[in-house]
Amino acid sequence: MASEERDGDVLLQLHPEEVVETDPQLPEEIERCSGLDYNDFFWRYMHKNIPVIIANVSNDWECQNWTVGQSSPESRDLNSNPSASSINFDYLKTKISDGPVPVANCNSSYFNSHTKLELNFHDYLAKWRSSIESQSSAAWTSAEVNSNVAPASGDNLYLKDWHLAAQMPGYNFYKVPKYFASDWLNEQLIQQGKDDYRFVYMGPKNSWTSYHADVFGSFSWSTNIVGLKKWLIMPPGEELKLNDRLGNLPFSIDEKMLDEHNVRYYTINQRANEAVFVPSGWFHQVWNLTDTISVNHNWFNGCNISMVWQNLKNNLKAVCNEISDCQQMDNFEAHCQTMLRASFGINYLDFIELLEFIAARRLAEGTVATKFLLFDSYTMNDYHVQYDLECLWKITRTLTEDPTIQCSPLQLEDRCQGLLARLEF
């Protein structure tokens, strides 16, 4: 059943899974869907941790004005391959205030990462525009779709991980698609005014993102506003075939490398107005085959919260091993948690506080008349709220059995037991 309009917001209709698959099979290729309803996306892709491409998600977004084309977003061919003049630099400069933005130089690396720098946004636009005009970029051809981008000489500057939505909260340049609205991570961070995981990426042809899996083992989604991206993406576990003798993963991959190591992988050619859903633990690398702008989120919810917890535990173990020679020091466990937060982004206390926050809101759904709005647009039906509460109960029960939590001087077990008591039903 499709999401329903109610009092100006959209109701996320979730219903019990009709056919329970204990061992979901990987698809032969990544599906491209249009008109997918929320319930189907939830059970067919998100719950099974399977990627999908969803078309026609950004037709009415304000940021369609960031592109140069026909007279209105509705009349443009959003899936056409853009020319060098596709970026509306004048509109971007007028609409978005100047200020520092994070930039990666894709032609320079430092400790297995692209070199990072900071530029003022308007300076970045000027450099990008000048590069297009001076290079007279060759037209996109279909032959490029099946070949990786060859690095050019000089700087190759990619504006990445820009918190534009947080920086300009009054500028509603996009709307979170309904498929991705169940987002525990950003629900908490936005409400509490903390750094979130909502990003804008802008980059020229030949810019790219190196081989990685997403932060926390989270889901991610990426919607192209303009441009064409190529993805190489693989199911969890396949990345182990690429480890060197020290267990290190490569910085960059290509089809030849993957074929030589017998890696199962998929190729995605993502067009404008399409969203790619990236499940937890799927390693990937992405190339911009044309000048490209995208909106991206990292997030997790009841479908993958257990994977995030497992990654958190694994990273704590790695931290403890790294400083194992300091085990006799006072507050060793607390020091490990501090290092865990620094390296992983959250620690055990942060994770429990997030569970407490989401639980409080879902429990309130059953006791107050007003529903909480997700991203100012969406509410959950009763079954969806119940599903979230059941997932919260299961993961909290798992936490109470963890030795680190049981022995924590921060009384983490007491907090988990208290949360578990509130979730009993």
Curated annotation (Swiss-Prot):
User: Where does the chain bind Fe cation?
Assistant: 212, 214, 284
Q: Which coenzymes or cofactors are required?
A: Fe(2+)
Q: Where in the cell is it found?
A: Nucleus; Cytoplasm
Per the record, the major location class is nucleus
* PROSITE patterns in the cross-refs: JMJC (PS51184)
GO cellular component term of the entry, any: cytoplasm
State the reactions this protein catalyses. L-lysyl-[protein] + 2-oxoglutarate + O2 = 4-hydroxy-L-lysyl-[protein] + succinate + CO2
Free-text function comment from the UniProt entry:
Catalyzes the 2-oxoglutarate and iron-dependent C4-lysyl hydroxylation of eRF1 thereby promoting the translational termination efficiency of eRF1. May be involved in regulation of chromatin structure, promoting expansion of heterochromatin.
Stated name of the protein = 2-oxoglutarate and iron-dependent oxygenase JMJD4 homolog
Entry's family note: Belongs to the JMJD6 family.
BP GO annotations: positive regulation of translational termination; protein hydroxylation
Where do the JmjC domain residues begin and end?
Answer: 165-316
Phenotype upon loss of function: Viable. No significant effect on behavior, circadian rhythms or sleep patterns.
InterPro entries named in the record = JmjC_dom (IPR003347), JMJD6_ArgDemeth/LysHydrox (IPR050910)
Tell me its EC number(s), please.
1.14.11.-
Annotated keywords? Cytoplasm, Dioxygenase, Iron, Metal-binding, Nucleus, Oxidoreductase
Q: Which GO terms describe its molecular function?
A: 2-oxoglutarate-dependent dioxygenase activity; metal ion binding; peptidyl-lysine 4-dioxygenase activity; sequence-specific DNA binding
